[in-house]
Amino acid sequence: MSDTLLAFDFGTKSIGVAIGQRITGTARPLPAIKAQDGTPDWTLIERLLKEWQPDEIIVGLPLNMDGTEQPLTARARKFANRIHGRFGVTVTLHDERLSTVEARSGLFERGGYRALNKGKVDSASAVIILESYFEQGY
């Protein structure tokens, strides 16, 4: 069973990032990565992988509330496949429904409107995705 996991909240302009430990079931945000129409700076992804050496990558899978796919779903899958193809690391897709809503709510409670900048919301969403993955017993 892997110990260190890196999570991504895929977006077309910003990709949230979180690091977590399976043994504690906790995660913390890392700085978000800017993207150009969903394409990240792959050298930044490579640096993250070298620095944290995760055993597994979790990518949030955006779904509609009824579980059906939306336009962003295919792009998140493509992002996950590219990470696996480029770096050979295990990548798992995980349902991310309501993670952004929960992230915004938590950030607002702690810091009001000033805390709601895009990068912070995206990385807070990545934390929620990873903690949800841990809670489901993975």
From Swiss-Prot:
Its EC number is 3.1.-.-. Its main location: cytoplasm. Disruption phenotype: Essential, it cannot be disrupted; cell division is arrested and cells form unseparated doublets with well-defined septa. It comes from Salmonella typhi. Belongs to the YqgF nuclease family. The lineage of its organism: Bacteria, Pseudomonadati, Pseudomonadota, Gammaproteobacteria, Enterobacterales. SUPFAM superfamilies: Ribonuclease H-like. Could be a nuclease involved in processing of the 5'-end of pre-16S rRNA. It is found in: Cytoplasm. It holds the Pfam family RuvX. Keywords: Cytoplasm, Hydrolase, Nuclease, Ribosome biogenesis. GO terms for biological process: rRNA 5'-end processing. One of its GO terms (cellular component) is cytosol. It is an enzyme of class 3 (hydrolase). GO terms for molecular function: nuclease activity. It comes from the Bacteria. This is Putative pre-16S rRNA nuclease.
